[in-house]
Amino acid sequence: MSLKRPAKDQPNTFEFNSSSLDAANAIIAKYPEGKQQSAVMALLYIVQRQNNNWIPLAAMKYIAKFLNMPYIKVYEVATFYSMYNLSPVGKYFVQVCTTTPCMIRGANKLVEACKEKISEKEAELSNDKSCSWMEVECLGACVNAPMMQINDD
């Protein structure tokens, strides 16, 4: 696993579009008064869907203001969970599980194939910008090891 770092090239601003804003407000409305910050994970997911499957720093700051919470708390959540992408990903985003059961059953061969066919380094776009890959923690299907996921499938 590699350390998750935000992309070097970042947009200066972010704002929810109308459908994302409606979705965010609907989620926040489900939380009791004073507990709306608990919606941070759901709002990060909404941002990622709106922003071509990655979350820029400006969006994390936007969520922090939206939920009236410190930016660092949003950043901590976004960098902790592997489901949040902090840099642009390709139209085809390959995630390879490299935890013990998958490594024992050949995940290293999947990683090598990704390096050869997509990009030498994980989290980098392919030459045609259509694909990217990264190592992830358990995808919850150890019985099928080695396991990989493309986009949400």
Region locations from a protein language model:
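Signature of N-terminal electron-transfer/Fe-S-associated modules in redox systems
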Residues: 1-153
